[in-house]
Design a protein with these regions (language model features):
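Intrinsically disordered, low-complexity regulatory regions
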Residues: 1-180
Length: 180
């Protein structure tokens, strides 16, 4: 379990580094996105991963690693947007965006550690393609919940689905980074 925490922190640091660099280049332009648009953006990334997994080749010189990183970052953006609502302008400083990023990354780590304890690291025996399918399933669930204006009868909400998408992406990145 100790390795899992360190591996999680390692891949989240990679994701955060890219997030911070894009934040510097573009500002928090993503603040204008409604959560449903964030969900669609995650869909594009997950669908591309699945397409690459099935076809085995890419026409664009980026593999699945960059798409898993994007899903982590868009998942955190989605959580921020759910908390604050979308904005009409880029209304957030880099410092505030990184503070929120770190808070949600920490929550994702805590959730992963709790689930990892209960499921005894079952994710390590799974295929990366299964994470892709689980992310796509979570996206479809999220779209259904968004279609119901966020209301559910018995299911977890949009935020829980974003957290799961983040963690499945982290699992994929751990497998890709550490060759497990």
């Amino acid at each position: 379990m100790k390795d899992t925490k360190q591996q999680f922190e390692h891949v989240i640091a990679i994701c955060r580094d890219l997030f911070a660099k894009k934040l510097h280049d573009y500002g928090a332009a993503w603040r204008i996105m409604r959560p449903s648009s964030v969900t669609d953006q995650i869909f594009i990334k997950a669908n591309r991963i699945r397409s690459i997994e099935i076809k085995g080749v890419t026409m664009v010189d980026e593999g699945i690693r960059s798409e898993f990183i994007a899903i982590v970052n868009y998942g955190i953006i989605g959580l921020i947007q759910l908390e604050l609502g979308y904005a009409e302008t880029d209304d957030m400083t880099e410092e505030r965006a990184l503070e929120l990023y770190d808070r949600y990354a920490k929550q994702a780590l805590e959730l992963m550690l709790a689930k990892n304890h209960d499921y005894d690291e079952a994710w390590r025996s799974m295929r990366v393609s299964s994470y892709t399918d689980l992310i796509l399933m979570k996206i479809y669930r999220t779209k259904q919940i968004e279609g119901h204006d966020g209301a559910t009868l018995v299911s977890e909400g949009i935020d829980a689905n974003y957290m799961d998408m983040i963690n499945y992406s982290v699992f994929g990145l751990i497998k890709l980074e550490f060759g497990e």
